Amino acid sequence: MATEMKRISVLKNIKTSKTAIINLCKYGDVKAVSKEKTIFPFTNDVASEVEIHAKLLTKNLSPKILDSDAALHSIIFEYLEGSNDLINYDELFLTKLGKAIKKLHLMDFNDIGAESFQQKINTYRQIFVDSDDSTILAGFELFDRLYDSPNNLVFCHNDINASNIFYTNDIKLIDWEYAGANLPIYDIASIIKSLKLDEDQTKILLDSYDIKLDVTKIKSFEL
């Protein structure tokens, strides 16, 4: 990737959060999306995100990175045509989503350097080591209970919600800031909770995902 990014012109702000400023822009003559990351201790850095996207691009699961600059904490992505403003999650959408998540979870991730979900939680612990906030402490207790034997880890997005899903003929996911090794049920539970799927919709998702999970634990992971 380039060390000096081609001049970009910002068209409008898409989202500003505690972890990034995301803008619709022109990259040269190409419509694109720019992300300027803030320094946040438990999100993937620019180098890790570039590595993740390169891997996922071969699976058609993410947008292509056009340019990046680690020193500026900036990444330029291709602009995705499609929608992430879906109202009705019909059978076709849920089937494609389940298959996309299955493809993600079956991917070999041993060559990806992103921290695991457990490592990110341990960073939280260090930051809040002296905290007596009951909500924070309850979160750590829940994590320890659910992850008492973290085997069968897969590569997870770890932040799947409606705004991170782009849908045209295929499903692509954006915002891989929290991605890393985790229990597969975490992604599934995140989808069910964030999309507010009912029992029938959940069955369609799980049938298309088609990897055995202990569905009785899904509610516990809807954090």
Q: Model-found features: residue ranges?
A:
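ATP-binding glycine-rich phosphate-binding loop
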Residues: 3-27
